[in-house]
From Swiss-Prot:
Region (G1): 174-181
Name assigned to this protein: Elongation factor 1 alpha-like protein
Gene3D superfamilies with a match to the protein in the record: P-loop containing nucleotide triphosphate hydrolases, Translation factors
Region (G2): 230-234
Segments of this protein annotated with the region G5: 352-354
SUPFAM superfamilies on file: EF-Tu/eEF-1alpha/eIF2-gamma C-terminal domain, P-loop containing nucleoside triphosphate hydrolases, Translation proteins
Protein source organism: Saccharomyces cerevisiae (strain ATCC 204508 / S288c)
Main location per the UniProt record: cytoplasm
Outcome reported for the amino acid change (mutating residue 255 to E): Loss of function. Abolished GTP-binding and ability to trigger the No-Go Decay (NGD) pathway and promote degradation of non-functional rRNAs
């Protein structure tokens, strides 16, 4: 309904329960205006308290989207925040800017910053009594303990793992325009996570922009930039469940300009789907002509992905030709084996992401079944979830808890010691009541609650859980925390775990790829580790690695393409320490990627922390 329909007065304005409901109320022009002005208004009110997103948007709406008038009005009614004294942290320096993993709710077509009710339902005793926070808390040194606390309701972890549904996170890779977002949008639609009404809306919006075939892709690509360019820019994660397993999709960009985003997505996934465009000459442009297919697979192998599904997409464009299927497989398989994948860990599935055949609901025709007798994509994913979940069956109370911080969620509450952090369990398990330490700030916190996100039908459910285990994506509600010194890329660990280092120099077991120039001492590059990127340089070339995987006595002056060596790396322009683990301590967290001049030049494992 248009704004003019309510122009007679504020009394005619409906009551909105949340920000999403208000966004749906706006017409397209109003929504675009709001997206243009709202971020500026929000940024200019960061020093004020007592507002939320909905109240700011309503104020903008009432002032006809006039930023200056809205600011003047709000500053008269809002109170300024008290400026806390900066705590003395274990880690020095200012925050390093990193890109966030965008967690997008598929059940809503317009993103918002609402928090699940459970995250903000509790206040401290002082808040309930109207007392102000005690500033003395923020001037103390961070509290670090090595004595674990007990869970509120202890669970037998081994029994929990055996009874829980398998969980699988997978990243979707492939050359630009291979159909990655369309494929994942079709899968979510077939699973009834997106309903027919929402799909019709996306159909209208895509037709307006002359991109009617993008309706499924727009389920995943929700920003204006992504829709206008027709490529995925950010990393979108979506959660869904079947009766057999739980899943997290990471839809990574395929365009060369956004390879760093793809690296961040790969680092969080258990396995990968490679989406291949089987149309005439399309595979060749992504594979032979310096496309992203090879680079994505090289990154996946380098970052510890061992299991692949090759989604042979757009098979309807070649009339489901077995010859075309086998032709592509014969070119791609030798390359995958050459870079480290085992043939037994690769599944090949013919599909059409747009029509849905071979994805989930729409069965293969009799003609296709004459030459392909394997499962569809969804069944292949479920089988992979069971296979990979067996690796977690050995989890017990003695495995160290390790957690990658992917997002820090702002809280509406004024409690100084509350932090809400989302991320992935890389090892072990965690239960409410247990304590953890966050690195590099080395602050010890108590886990108050654990939340998992799931989507059923048309709604998003945020549920509490008593246990989170390796592989789970969860939000932790922490007490006794300093959220201002927690960042994306930080690591949390059991309080009695002492293997995380904050160092400037370390040794890599490095493998180089195709490079324009050799690596020499002093060569600068960008180091990617997890969701962090950091300028670094070659400090020292130590030795080549021979075929027996041992250090060679041959003198090393420079490192060329496709060579292996032990190399000492030095981080430069360090604004904030990066928590480090060796690959021996954790195989996934100890892996890094090196990029220079827009190209991936090498990858490696941290073998030793030197200083």
């Amino acid at each position: 309904m248009a704004y003019s329909d309510y122009s007679d007065g504020a009394d005619d304005m409906p009551d909105f329960h949340d920000e999403g409901e208000f966004d749906d109320y706006l017409n397209d022009d109003e929504y675009d205006l709001m997206n243009e002005v709202f971020p500026t208004l929000k940024a200019q009110l960061q020093d004020y308290q007592g507002w939320d997103n909905l109240s700011l948007k309503l104020a903008l709406f009432d002032n006809n989207f006039d930023l200056e008038s809205t600011l003047a009005e709000l500053k008269k009614t809002l109170k300024k925040k008290k400026t806390p004294k900066k705590p003395i942290a274990a880690a020095n320096g200012s925050a390093n800017v990193t890109q966030k993993l965008a967690n997008i709710s598929i059940s809503q077509q317009r993103p918002n910053d609402r928090l699940p009710d459970w995250l903000d339902e509790e206040e401290s005793e002082g808040e309930r009594n109207g007392e102000e926070a005690n500033d003395e808390k923020t001037v103390q040194r961070y509290y670090k303990t090595t004595v674990p606390t007990k869970p509120k309701k202890p669970h037998d972890i081994s029994a929990f793992v055996k009874s829980a549904l398998p969980h699988l996170s997978f990243v979707v890779l492939g050359h630009v325009d291979a159909g990655k977002s369309t494929l994942m949008g079709r899968l979510l639609y077939d699973l009834n996570i997106v309903n027919q009404s929402q799909l019709r809306k996306l159909q209208r919006e895509s037709e307006t922009m002359g991109k009617s075939s993008f309706k499924f892709a727009w389920i995943m690509d929700q920003t204006n930039e992504e829709r206008e360019r027709g490529v995925t820019v950010s990393i979108c994660t979506s959660h869904f469940s079947t009766h057999r397993a739980n899943f997290t999709i990471v839809d990574a960009p395929g365009h060369r300009d956004f390879v760093p985003n793809a690296i961040m997505g790969i680092s969080q996934a258990d396995m990968a789907i490679l989406c291949v465009d089987c149309s005439t000459n399309a595979f060749e442009s992504g594979f032979d002509l310096d496309g992203q297919t090879k680079e994505h697979m090289l990154l996946a192998s380098s970052l510890g992905i061992h299991n692949l599904i090759i989604a042979m997409n757009k098979m309807d464009n070649v009339d489901w030709s077995q010859q075309r299927f086998e032709e592509i497989k014969s070119k791609l398989l030798p390359y995958l084996v050459d870079i480290g994948f085992f043939e037994d860990n690769i599944n090949w599935v013919p599909i059409s992401g747009f029509s849905g055949e071979g994805v989930y609901k729409i069965e293969y025709t009799d003609e296709v079944r004459q030459w392909y007798n394997g499962p569809n994509l969804m069944s292949t994913l479920e089988n992979a979830a069971f296979k990979i979940s067996k690796e977690n069956e050995g989890i017990n109370k003695d495995d160290p808890f390790l957690f990658s911080v992917l997002e820090i969620i702002p809280s509406k509450k004024t409690s100084n010691d509350l932090a809400l952090v989302s991320g992935k369990l890389e090892s072990g398990s965690i239960q409410p009541g247990e304590s953890l330490t966050i690195y590099p700030s080395e602050q010890s916190c108590i886990v108050d609650k654990i939340q998992v996100g799931s989507q059923q039908g048309q709604s998003t459910n945020h549920e509490e859980t008593d246990v989170a285990i390796k592989g789970d994506f969860v939000t932790l509600k922490l007490r006794k925390a300093y959220p201002e010194d927690i960042q994306n890329g930080d690591l949390a660990a059991s309080v009695d775990y002492s293997s995380i280092h904050s160092a400037q120099c370390f040794v890599l077991e490095l493998t180089t790829f195709d490079m324009n120039r050799p690596l020499l001492p002093g060569t600068p590059f960008i180091l990617f580790i997890g969701v962090k990127e950091q300028p670094a340089r070659i400090k020292r070339l130590i030795s080549f690695i021979d075929k027996g995987n041992t250090a060679s006595k041959k003198k090393i002056r420079h490192l060329g393409s496709k060579q292996r060596a032990f190399v000492e790396i030095e981080l430069i322009e360090v604004k904030r320490w990066i928590p480090l683990l060796t690959a021996h301590e954790n195989d996934r967290l100890g892996r890094v990627v090196l990029r220079k001049d827009g190209r991936t030049i090498a990858a490696g494992k941290i073998s030793e922390i030197t200083q």
